[in-house]
Amino acid sequence: METHPSIVDTAIASLKKYAVFFKTEITDISAQDLAVEAKLNSLDRIRAGMADVTSETTDQFIPQMLNLDLLDFISFKKGCYTGQEVVARAHYLGAVKRRMYLLALATDSVPASGQTLSNSEGKQLGTIVNAEANEQGQVEALAVLSTSSTEIKTVVLDQTETSVELLNLPYELG
Protein backbone atom coordinates (compact mmCIF):
# COMPACT_ATOMS: atom_id res chain seq x y z
CA MET A 1 0.00 0.00 0.00
CA GLU A 2 1.33 3.42 -0.89
CA THR A 3 0.30 6.37 1.25
CA HIS A 4 1.33 9.98 1.76
CA PRO A 5 4.21 10.37 4.25
CA SER A 6 2.12 12.64 6.50
CA ILE A 7 -0.29 9.80 7.35
CA VAL A 8 1.98 6.73 7.37
CA ASP A 9 1.98 6.39 11.17
CA THR A 10 -1.82 6.76 11.38
CA ALA A 11 -2.37 4.25 8.56
CA ILE A 12 -0.05 1.65 10.09
CA ALA A 13 -1.67 2.02 13.52
CA SER A 14 -5.12 1.51 11.97
CA LEU A 15 -4.03 -1.52 9.96
CA LYS A 16 -2.34 -3.18 12.93
CA LYS A 17 -5.71 -3.39 14.70
CA TYR A 18 -6.81 -5.86 12.03
CA ALA A 19 -3.53 -7.78 11.74
CA VAL A 20 -4.41 -9.92 14.77
CA PHE A 21 -7.20 -11.57 12.75
CA PHE A 22 -4.90 -12.58 9.91
CA LYS A 23 -1.51 -14.22 9.61
CA THR A 24 0.20 -11.05 8.47
CA GLU A 25 2.85 -8.57 9.42
CA ILE A 26 2.71 -4.84 8.73
CA THR A 27 5.97 -3.01 8.22
CA ASP A 28 6.81 0.55 7.18
CA ILE A 29 9.29 0.27 4.29
CA SER A 30 9.00 3.89 3.12
CA ALA A 31 12.68 4.57 3.78
CA GLN A 32 13.60 1.68 1.45
CA ASP A 33 11.18 2.64 -1.32
CA LEU A 34 12.78 5.80 -2.70
CA ALA A 35 12.87 4.48 -6.29
CA VAL A 36 9.07 4.38 -6.48
CA GLU A 37 8.76 8.00 -5.37
CA ALA A 38 11.36 9.12 -7.91
CA LYS A 39 9.53 7.28 -10.69
CA LEU A 40 6.12 8.78 -10.04
CA ASN A 41 6.52 12.24 -8.58
CA SER A 42 3.75 14.44 -7.30
CA LEU A 43 3.06 16.30 -10.56
CA ASP A 44 2.83 12.99 -12.45
CA ARG A 45 0.32 11.70 -9.89
CA ILE A 46 -1.72 14.91 -10.18
CA ARG A 47 -1.80 14.64 -13.98
CA ALA A 48 -2.84 10.99 -13.65
CA GLY A 49 -5.76 12.05 -11.43
CA MET A 50 -4.49 10.04 -8.47
CA ALA A 51 -5.04 11.88 -5.20
CA ASP A 52 -2.70 11.71 -2.24
CA VAL A 53 -4.70 12.08 0.96
CA THR A 54 -2.65 14.10 3.43
CA SER A 55 -3.08 14.86 7.11
CA GLU A 56 -4.82 18.11 6.06
CA THR A 57 -7.44 16.28 3.98
CA THR A 58 -8.00 13.14 6.05
CA ASP A 59 -11.73 12.50 6.69
CA GLN A 60 -12.86 15.27 4.30
CA PHE A 61 -13.88 13.12 1.33
CA ILE A 62 -15.67 9.89 0.55
CA PRO A 63 -13.87 7.68 -2.02
CA GLN A 64 -16.16 8.73 -4.89
CA MET A 65 -15.22 12.39 -4.42
CA LEU A 66 -11.61 11.39 -5.18
CA ASN A 67 -12.79 9.36 -8.21
CA LEU A 68 -11.56 6.11 -6.64
CA ASP A 69 -14.64 4.34 -7.96
CA LEU A 70 -13.80 5.42 -11.51
CA LEU A 71 -10.28 4.04 -11.11
CA ASP A 72 -11.69 0.69 -9.86
CA PHE A 73 -10.00 1.18 -6.49
CA ILE A 74 -13.22 0.26 -4.65
CA SER A 75 -14.99 -3.08 -4.63
CA PHE A 76 -18.73 -2.84 -4.11
CA LYS A 77 -19.08 -6.63 -3.95
CA LYS A 78 -17.02 -7.42 -0.87
CA GLY A 79 -15.44 -6.01 2.21
CA CYS A 80 -16.41 -4.53 5.50
CA TYR A 81 -15.03 -1.17 6.49
CA THR A 82 -15.96 1.99 8.33
CA GLY A 83 -18.25 4.12 6.19
CA GLN A 84 -19.12 1.30 3.80
CA GLU A 85 -22.84 2.09 3.90
CA VAL A 86 -22.32 5.74 2.93
CA VAL A 87 -19.95 4.78 0.11
CA ALA A 88 -22.31 2.08 -1.21
CA ARG A 89 -25.34 4.36 -0.98
CA ALA A 90 -23.59 7.06 -3.01
CA HIS A 91 -22.63 4.43 -5.59
CA TYR A 92 -26.00 2.72 -5.97
CA LEU A 93 -28.10 5.89 -5.79
CA GLY A 94 -25.74 7.88 -8.00
CA ALA A 95 -25.82 10.75 -5.51
CA VAL A 96 -22.22 11.97 -5.81
CA LYS A 97 -22.48 15.76 -5.92
CA ARG A 98 -18.75 16.46 -5.71
CA ARG A 99 -15.96 15.03 -7.83
CA MET A 100 -12.24 15.59 -8.21
CA TYR A 101 -11.12 17.65 -11.20
CA LEU A 102 -7.75 18.58 -12.67
CA LEU A 103 -7.19 22.34 -12.71
CA ALA A 104 -4.58 24.70 -14.13
CA LEU A 105 -4.30 27.81 -11.95
CA ALA A 106 -2.66 30.98 -13.31
CA THR A 107 -0.51 31.54 -10.24
CA ASP A 108 2.99 30.68 -9.10
CA SER A 109 1.85 30.28 -5.49
CA VAL A 110 1.16 26.60 -4.80
CA PRO A 111 -1.95 26.18 -2.62
CA ALA A 112 -1.79 23.78 0.30
CA SER A 113 -3.75 20.55 0.52
CA GLY A 114 -7.08 21.29 2.17
CA GLN A 115 -7.15 24.93 1.06
CA THR A 116 -10.57 26.26 0.08
CA LEU A 117 -11.42 27.49 -3.42
CA SER A 118 -14.05 30.24 -3.41
CA ASN A 119 -15.76 32.47 -5.94
CA SER A 120 -15.57 36.28 -5.86
CA GLU A 121 -18.63 36.44 -3.55
CA GLY A 122 -16.90 34.20 -1.00
CA LYS A 123 -18.99 31.08 -1.71
CA GLN A 124 -16.96 27.90 -1.28
CA LEU A 125 -16.55 26.06 -4.59
CA GLY A 126 -14.25 23.27 -3.51
CA THR A 127 -11.11 22.05 -1.80
CA ILE A 128 -7.55 21.56 -3.04
CA VAL A 129 -6.49 17.92 -2.71
CA ASN A 130 -2.95 18.20 -4.14
CA ALA A 131 -1.13 20.90 -6.11
CA GLU A 132 2.29 21.39 -7.71
CA ALA A 133 3.96 24.01 -9.89
CA ASN A 134 4.46 22.97 -13.50
CA GLU A 135 7.11 23.80 -16.10
CA GLN A 136 5.10 26.76 -17.47
CA GLY A 137 5.04 28.64 -14.17
CA GLN A 138 1.44 27.72 -13.42
CA VAL A 139 0.01 25.40 -10.80
CA GLU A 140 -1.70 22.13 -11.63
CA ALA A 141 -4.03 20.91 -8.93
CA LEU A 142 -6.50 18.20 -8.10
CA ALA A 143 -9.51 19.77 -6.44
CA VAL A 144 -12.84 18.41 -5.28
CA LEU A 145 -15.57 20.65 -6.69
CA SER A 146 -19.32 20.56 -6.78
CA THR A 147 -20.39 19.01 -10.07
CA SER A 148 -22.40 22.20 -10.65
CA SER A 149 -19.27 24.39 -10.35
CA THR A 150 -17.39 23.09 -13.39
CA GLU A 151 -17.95 26.18 -15.55
CA ILE A 152 -15.78 28.39 -13.34
CA LYS A 153 -13.23 30.73 -14.94
CA THR A 154 -11.79 32.30 -11.78
CA VAL A 155 -11.33 31.26 -8.16
CA VAL A 156 -10.19 33.05 -5.03
CA LEU A 157 -7.16 31.60 -3.26
CA ASP A 158 -5.72 33.41 -0.23
CA GLN A 159 -7.89 36.45 -1.02
CA THR A 160 -6.42 36.68 -4.55
CA GLU A 161 -8.55 36.10 -7.64
CA THR A 162 -6.88 33.67 -10.05
CA SER A 163 -7.98 32.41 -13.45
CA VAL A 164 -8.57 28.68 -13.66
CA GLU A 165 -8.89 26.18 -16.49
CA LEU A 166 -10.40 22.71 -16.19
CA LEU A 167 -8.03 20.16 -17.75
CA ASN A 168 -8.94 16.68 -18.92
CA LEU A 169 -8.23 13.79 -16.62
CA PRO A 170 -6.92 10.59 -18.23
CA TYR A 171 -10.21 8.87 -17.37
CA GLU A 172 -13.89 9.68 -17.89
CA LEU A 173 -15.85 11.26 -15.05
CA GLY A 174 -18.98 9.40 -16.12
Segments predicted by a language model, with ranges:
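Hot-dog-fold acyl-thioester-processing enzymes
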Residues: 20, 77-78, 122
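Residue-level signal for inorganic ion chemistry
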Residues: 1, 83, 122
